[in-house]
């Protein structure tokens, strides 16, 4: 771990603690919200402990559903979900699966096919369309999430007896920047200032580790909810919760298991009755409601009955479902949850026996087969049973809210999260120059000096990428900006300081400064930026492993070419400088060196696709001409360079 990381960690500790002193007066009571795909939960740190707050129906978790009745009345939570089967086209859910994504996203297109409500394309963003009274209205996923957040705000205010304006909201660890920004926007729409976005497995680790602050432990959090899946590996040591590695899938959860059951029963009905019930939205939603109940029953029973009155065209439906059949239908999905577990183990460098505790979070971890797979992976190690999987994330968010608002008994907790992907910029030859490696603790800030690639270059373009491959063409483009007004100077002379800064919410800001003139420019990678889908993240990581040898060869070739080019131009500049080397050589010697450098430059222009060995040979040829001449001046030493070499933009 480098010096800059230690400094970042230390500063975070100070900022967290000093923040506490003034937070209470500024924010009032800060609540913690777990904004889930299928259910949401709210908590508050009060009287020295976390209170998970029940809604007006007495339930501690609230469905993430919004509906509009025939007369335009808006229903949120239990009331909305309860009328799903009678009003399917005007009942909205799954906003979390759409938020921050493009309309043409593969997962979005797959989800649209099973929704009873319409999803329309508005500027390549998915909008959820319903009938509100006499008019049709399209809602952005942020708006629907905002309605759910406003319900959680209302639940907290009813319990506290005071207005709530600030919150900590959780998101899946693998949410990208666009999804995080969109979640913050949803909070603002709901009248909440989202002080912090924290990762769900990290929040769960806080819930687990709050009473274990004095011991050092390695914790693996396995968070499988209704629509998303995360795995994070953390260390807990003296109140410091540090994420070591994270992985996951923002499109895997209990709803996918339900869909497998729905597909199975639809086929079964068609086989027996010769009719397709998918043409009737009400029938499908009735079936969805019953398979969800059956799935829950099968967590404790080995068999159950799916019984639905008047399912389709006046006919009742009754079919058995066993736990074995449920597991068979979802076998591939269940087993796919182990891939991110393997990934975080690999990234952390820890062995299975190094894991002190496994924390299961999210309602889907109640499925016995999931528990069995995790247990077997860790050599029959029993997962921790100390926390409620439905409430753990909101619990941790409430603790973090307490830290921010200055509540006593939380001041010694420090939360250190990580960025899930490497961030960097493109340098000469299309090389991905990494500034912030994957799994770096955030918040973090990293700067590096670069220079120009051509003489008298007035502008440099900073192109920002994320990904694990050595070449930018294989990574994901985030954005770009120009730094202009660079005074005329030989290539390699200007000093351009590029700074990457990731804040506590995982949001990236990139700036560039010409150290000579002080001129600056920057970009914030925000919700308008086309950030990665989780599938692209997983593909990049897999590709990085698959093509690692090929990548090394390509990178070596570009580096050797850059070395040759830098040497040729550096030598030319030095022999022109009469104050230095140029003043100590004869005209014939200067011409010999310049001709050799020009020949190397011309060869590179004529051979852009040359192999690594060819570049090395050309460099050796150039050195064989230059070395004997300058060795007389420097007693056999290599020619001096003007300064420490800098990568070129």
UniProtKB/Swiss-Prot annotation:
PROSITE patterns (UniProt xref): ER_TARGET, HSP70_1, HSP70_2, HSP70_3
A GO term for molecular function: ATP binding
Span of the annotated motif Prevents secretion from ER: 646-649
EC number, UniProt record: 3.6.4.10
Signal peptide extent: 1-20
Main location: endoplasmic reticulum
Enzyme class: hydrolase
Subcellular location: Endoplasmic reticulum lumen
Region Substrate-binding (SBD), residue ranges: 399-499
Binding sites annotated in the UniProt record for ATP: 36-39, 96, 226-228, 292-299, 363-366
Keywords: ATP-binding, Chaperone, Endoplasmic reticulum, Hydrolase, Nucleotide-binding, Signal
Pfam families associated with the record: HSP70
Location of the region described as Nucleotide-binding (NBD) in the Swiss-Prot/TrEMBL record: 125-279
Top-level division of the source organism's lineage: Eukaryota
GO (cellular component) term, any one: endoplasmic reticulum lumen
Regulation: The chaperone activity is regulated by ATP-induced allosteric coupling of the nucleotide-binding (NBD) and substrate-binding (SBD) domains. In the ADP-bound and nucleotide-free (apo) states, the two domains have little interaction. In contrast, in the ATP-bound state the two domains are tightly coupled, which results in drastically accelerated kinetics in both binding and release of polypeptide substrates. J domain-containing co-chaperones stimulate the ATPase activity and are required for efficient substrate recognition.
InterPro entries named among the record's database cross-references: ATPase_NBD (IPR043129), BIP_NBD (IPR042050), Heat_shock_70_CS (IPR018181), HSP70_C_sf (IPR029048), HSP70_peptide-bd_sf (IPR029047), Hsp_70_fam (IPR013126)
Catalytic reaction list: ATP + H2O = ADP + phosphate + H(+)
Function: Endoplasmic reticulum chaperone that plays a key role in protein folding and quality control in the endoplasmic reticulum lumen. Involved in the correct folding of proteins and degradation of misfolded proteins. Acts as a key repressor of the unfolded protein response (UPR).
Family statement: Belongs to the heat shock protein 70 family.
Protein name per UniProt: Endoplasmic reticulum chaperone BiP
Species of origin: Echinococcus multilocularis (Fox tapeworm)
